[in-house]
Amino acid sequence: MEECLKMIYTRRSIRVYSDRQISDEDIEKILKAAMLAPSAGNEQPWHFIVVRDREMLKKMSEAFTFGQMLPNASAAIVVCADPKLSKYPYDMWVQDCSAATENILLAARCLGIGSVWLGVYPREERMKALRELLGIPENIVVFSVVSLGYPKDEKDFYEADDRFNPDRIHREKW
């Protein structure tokens, strides 16, 4: 199997982390991958906040129903958007930031780092909580948070059950 596909097929939401810290160099590699995501009209509307402070990660976890992994994460990346950068009258930044978030997940997997995508947008209470905690300006939309850490057990990277479903594929028309 090609190495790239292996990384995709074995990417999981990893919620239990070891104490090993992620290097600044690897965080930068992950952010570079995020910034190489496709964006409508090449507008690249994203901004990223890297959070490593353990107390802040704990506070951030309280904004989520399922954010319990954040206090033990090595880092979190908050993906934000500046909708004013849009060249179009519709919100293409949502797709752009989704692509950037997925690139973060895949780059982390390629580096042996576990990750979890925590949805923020369009949940107003989550956006408000993170905006207040992190000093994010009102004109910036908080899109997602990605929790990052080395898995406590390397076996967490396993190939999932085959989710391929030919019934969901339509050729030429529905």
Swiss-Prot record:
Cofactor(s) annotated in UniProt: FMN
Binding site for NAD(+): A107, A108, R109, C110, L111, G112
Domain of life assignment: Archaea
Pfam families: Nitroreductase
SUPFAM superfamilies: FMN-dependent nitroreductase-like
UniProt EC number: 1.-.-.-
GO molecular function: oxidoreductase activity
Signal sequence bounds: none
Keyword field: Flavoprotein, FMN, NAD, NADP, Oxidoreductase
EC class name: oxidoreductase
InterPro entries: Nitroreductase, Nitroreductase-like, Nitroreductase/BluB, YdjA-like
UniProt keyword annotation of Flavoprotein present: yes
Chain ranges passing through the membrane: none
Entry's family note: Belongs to the nitroreductase family.
PANTHER family reported for this sequence: IODOTYROSINE DEIODINASE 1, NADPH NITROREDUCTASE
Protein name, per record: Putative NADH dehydrogenase/NAD(P)H nitroreductase AF_2267
Organism: Archaeoglobus fulgidus (strain ATCC 49558 / DSM 4304 / JCM 9628 / NBRC 100126 / VC-16)
Lineage: Archaea, Methanobacteriati, Methanobacteriota, Archaeoglobi, Archaeoglobales
